[in-house]
C-alpha cells in the first residue's frame, strides 16, 4: 500500500493546555468498540465516570458532554484517561485527531484537520507544500485507474491555479467545470485562464450575500459564537491565508469525486467554504478553524452543502462568481 502525506504532516504536535480552543468540548466523541469495552470494564472512580457518560446510539458509542465539556477533561487542560492510563488507552478519535486518513484503495493519503487551532496555524501559514510518498500503490481498485489519474492531475493543477491566479476563487470554480469535462471523457485541453475570467464576468449576477449566508445559517450550528459570526459578517480582501485554505480544501475533497464522478459539487463546496471565511472576516486563521469545526466536522453539514450545490439559491454559479469578485 502506498502512503502519501504532506511534507509538513509530521511537524504537528498537540499543544494541549496551551491550545486557544479545545477538541475536548462542544462535541460528543465517537468511541471505537475496543475502547468502549475497556472503559465499561474499568474499575474505580475513572470507570464509574466513563460509564456515566458513555451512550449508545444507532449502533455507535459516544462519550457525551458534561456541561459542554468532555467529562475526562481536567481543569489543567489535560485528559484524565491519558494521564491515568496512558496514551494507548485513548479511543481512536482522540488518539488520531486532528490527523486525517483517506483510503483510496490503491493508496492512502494522510492530512491534518483544519478544525484544530495548531494544525490550522500550520496549514494556513504555508505558501505551498508537496506530497511525500512511501510504499507501492496496489493495482486492484474499485475504480478505473484512468479516473483517479485524471483527478490527481487536475487536483495538482487546481492547487497551482489558486496559488497564482489573481482571482483564485472564481478561477477555481470555472476550472472545476473544465476538469469535470475531462473526467466525463472530453479531450484534454489547456485551461485558458484569461478566457475563463472573461466568462466569469459574463456569468456573474448582481450578487446576493444574504442568500449565500442563509445556506450556512440553515445548517446545524454548534456554538453561539459561530451563530453570531454568521449574523454579523465583516468582509475582508483576499489574503495569502485564503490561498492556503483553498489548497487545503482542494487536497481534502477533490479526489472524493472518484466515488460518483461529481467534481462540480465538490468544487462548489471548496469555493463556498473559502468564500464564507472571507465574507465573515476577522482573523483568517481563527475564522477558518471555527468554520471547519462547525461545518467540516459535521458530516450532515457537508452533505447538505454538497446537495445544495445545484439547488440552493445562494450557491448558484452566478451568485458565487459575483461574490468571489467583490
Which residue stretches match the model-derived regions?
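Internal, well-ordered alpha/beta segment that forms a basic, Gly-enriched binding/recognition surface
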Residues: 77, 85-169
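Long, low-complexity, compositionally biased intrinsically disordered regions
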Residues: 1-21, 26, 105, 118-120, ...
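Short, charged/polar micro-motifs that form catalytic or ligand-binding hotspots
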Residues: 14, 84, 144, 148, ...
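Polybasic, low-complexity association/targeting segments
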Residues: 9-59
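Active-site-adjacent structural elements in folded domains
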Residues: 9, 142, 261
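Hydrophobic, aromatic-lined core segments that form the binding pocket/scaffold
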Residues: 160-326
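Immediate flanking context of iron-sulfur cluster ligation sites
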Residues: 1-19, 53-91, 108
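Structured loops at beta-to-helix junctions and adjacent beta-edge loops in soluble globular domains
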Residues: 17, 27, 73, 82, ...
